Design a protein with these regions (language model features):
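Conserved AdoMet/S-adenosylmethionine-binding subsite of the radical SAM
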Residues: 1-157
Length: 157
């Protein structure tokens, strides 16, 4: 985990009786950190920044680091996990299923959450419709972006 002292903090919180969820992109080994739930949010291929807009170096680094199958396996094998994906297009379900098919041990449908991509209520409603249909078809869970619905696309929420 990136934060200095994060393992000690997690241990202290757990020892104090707190339920601890760690959310991560799944690119860094868990290294024995304690938690009740690991919420893994692997980045899909459309998350790679546009090289023309952000520079070739940034785009290349992101693409090289966005998926670490061996790290996803380490989390899945050693922790109670859920896998959360931000979905902007119905066709992404194929990429999601392919990614999940490579995880060992594989998560069950109830451990997979699909969240519509969007930063405003209108796009969330539009995308939420097809994401809900994907969830009905696959048995995956629907995950709303409640913070945007309640507060809008504001920093700190």
């Amino acid at each position: 985990m990136l934060g200095k002292g994060i393992h000690d903090l997690a241990s202290q919180l757990k020892a104090s009786g707190y339920h601890l969820t760690i959310e991560t992109a799944g690119t860094i080994e868990p290294e024995g950190i304690v938690c009740d739930l690991a919420s893994l949010s692997p980045k899909l291929s459309d998350s790679t920044p546009d090289a023309e807009q952000f520079g070739e170096g940034w785009s290349k680094r992101h693409e090289e680091c966005r998926l670490k199958p061996e790290v996803l396996d380490a989390w899945s094998a050693g922790y109670h996990c859920q896998f959360k994906f931000v979905v902007s297009d119905p066709g992404q379900i194929e990429e999601i299923n392919e990614l999940l098919g490579g995880v060992s041990p594989p998560p069950g449908p109830g451990q997979v959450l699909l969240m519509p991509e969007g930063t405003d209520p209108e796009s969330l409603q539009d995308r939420g419709q097809f994401v809900a249909e994907l969830c009905k078809r696959t048995g995956y869970r629907f995950c709303p972006r409640l913070h945007i619905e309640l507060f809008g696309n504001t920093k700190g929420t």
